[in-house]
Amino acid sequence: MNTVRVTFLLVFVLAVSLGRADKDENRMEMQEKTEQGKSYLDFAENLLLQKLEELEAKLLEEDSEESRNSRQKRCIGEGVPCDENDPRCCSGLVCLKPTLHGIWYKSYYCYKK
């Protein structure tokens, strides 16, 4: 009976000591994995940041192209009221006081030259 107790005690001590070693190893593995995970996250974050910077550069480039090609001021079409001091009539039109049918209106209109 003593041999059974000694054997059981020996197996118990080995299990506890190996179990703690496994626990320490598991803790070390978890730390390594979290460190690797952090490095992967840093890598992914840097990659995402680069992509966002490229997108931003493209968008800013498109904005600058649009501003170069866009009209500075919109022009006023034919028969539309205009300001006598600041005419914005389209090319080929002149800001004039209306004749005949529009004489009761006190504003100027864009007419063909």
Swiss-Prot record:
Presence of the UniProt keyword Lipoprotein in the record: no
Taxonomic path: Eukaryota, Metazoa, Ecdysozoa, Arthropoda, Chelicerata
Domain commentary: The presence of a 'disulfide through disulfide knot' structurally defines this protein as a knottin.
Gene Ontology MF term list: sodium channel inhibitor activity; toxin activity
Protein name, entry field: U11-theraphotoxin-Hhn1a
InterPro entries per the UniProt record, alphabetical: Toxin_22
The keyword Cell division is annotated on this UniProt entry: no
Species whose genome carries this gene: Cyriopagopus hainanus
Family, per entry: Belongs to the neurotoxin 14 (magi-1) family. 01 (HNTX-16) subfamily.
Main location: secreted
Disulfide bond positions: C75-C90, C82-C95, C89-C110
Signal peptide range: 1-21
Expression sites (tissue/organ): Expressed by the venom gland.
Function: Probable ion channel inhibitor.
Location relative to the cell: Secreted
Propeptide: 22-74
UniProtKB keywords: Disulfide bond, Ion channel impairing toxin, Knottin, Secreted, Signal, Toxin
Listed GO CC annotations: extracellular region
